Amino acid sequence: MVTVFSFKKTVYLCSMRNNFEETGLITAESLLQIKAIKLDNANPFTWASGIKSPIYCDNRRTLSYPKIRTYLRQEFVKMINEEFGTVDLIAGVATGAIAIGALVAQDLGLPFVYVRSEKKSHGLENQIEGVVESGQSVVVVEDLISTGKSSLNAVQALRDAGCNVKGMVAIFTYGLSDAEENFKAASCTLHTLTNYDFLIKKALEQNHIKDSDMQSLIKWRENPKGWGQDK
C-alpha cells in the first residue's frame, strides 16, 4: 500500500494528475532503491555550477533496471496523454534523457529527436539531431531539473526551429525557486514524476536520513547557493 501525503501543487514543478502523489512516492522510492539519488548531509556534493548540495541525482542509473525503466516510460506516456493530448514529436534533452525519451516516443508511435546543449562545432553543426519540421507540436523529455536553464535551452532551440513546444516532462525536480522562475519566464509548463518533497518523505520513512537532517535539507532548498558556504 502506498501512503499518500499532501504536497503543494504548482503547474511548473509537479504534475497536476489525480494520482500525482502515488506516482511521486513510487518514483522516489525506486530512485532511492537503485541509488540513483544519494543523500549526504555531512559530506555535500559539489555540482558543476559550484553549488554545494546534500543531494546528488543520477537518473541514468534507471536504464539498467528494466522494471523501473518500464514504469517510468509508462508513467511518462500517461502524463503526456493526459496533460498535453495529441503531439507530433517527442524531443529528449541530451544526454540524460535521450534513452528514456526514445522509449516514450516508441510507445506513443511518434518521431523522436534529441537536442544538444549547443550546436556541434563540426560536420552539419546540428543542435537538434533528427528530423524536425516547422509547425510540429513537441513535448520535451528531461531526466532532471535543477535550475532549468539547460532544459530550457533545448526548448528554445526547438522554438527557433519553428516547433510549438507544448511543455516538458521530467523524472525529478529539486523544486528550486530558480527553476520555477525560469520556467515561468520561458512560458513553458513542466510536469514531473517526482520531486524533492516526495523524495525526502520516502528517504525519512526508509531511514536513508534521520529526523535531525531534515532542517538542513529544507534550508538547502530555500538557499542552495548560500547553504554550503560553511562546509
Say what each PLM segment does.
Residues 16-84:
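Active-site-facing substrate-recognition patch
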Residues 85-94, 169:
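Short glycine-rich phosphate-binding loop at a beta-alpha junction
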Residues 101-139, 147-153:
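Short, glycine/charge-rich flexible loops or terminal/linker lids adjacent to PRPP-binding catalytic cores
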